[in-house]
């Protein structure tokens, strides 16, 4: 399954470069979302610092310059996935951070500074559309002459999602609150716990029936590396923090970033968003190749979990997906010695 891992690494590198370049290319449009990216990047750096301190013995011999370089790249990468991913989420009709955005909303003034709201916009906080592409309310629609399409004109009979071109984000209207305000934090927490419990039950049954073993590659890794994979045999504060960090970063990259990127660029909004969920879950599962023997067991475990996390994001936002992933990783770390040879 080495080829699966290579394909995954190439795909991840591709998406990383795309998001970093889009952060630069769309800097005006994504400006209102920078605060979320800086917050996520800072949280990841704090995780990295604590992990380095706790795993100092395992990292002995690694130069300080290498650690600082890796941490700097981690900050840039996660900030790019957060900022651009939140922008794509906005376009696909999602509140990326429903709890955080209610506390720190994107205002019309911020979007006006990004060139995407009219000066006469309301002072109420901006919210994404109920489902799918944003409404045309507030957009200047100039119908072209019959049989003629004027550059920059929005055709009244054009059913393509907005913004359909890279300049269309500059004319985004003030958007309405999505039709999910009735979802309360207790409901989100309840759904999160149900997803975690279901994923753990499925994992226990699958591993009990198939009796997998750690692959030769994983057995040769250090405690720091195996903890990053959630396969360490020793549960300590260091390994717990590390699996939480991995879950946090993976949800930002896959569910917030790649999933919304696919939804926008392949027009998988609305009911078709489930296609983006499945595609992202498949890519995420490929990243876990080579951990167990036989290899298919890990893929069979991870793909359904990815579907559940994708649904959780779609329904309750990235905070719920991050919490579910973190709890699943912690529980998996505890259960690993009894489930895997």
Listing of model-derived features with the role each one plays in the protein:
Residues 8-15, 41-45, 78-83, 192-204, ...:
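Alpha-helical transmembrane spans of integral membrane proteins, capturing the lipid-embedded, hydrophobic core
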Residues 24-25, 52-63, 208, 289-290:
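Juxtamembrane "helix-exit" motif on the non-cytosolic side of transmembrane helices
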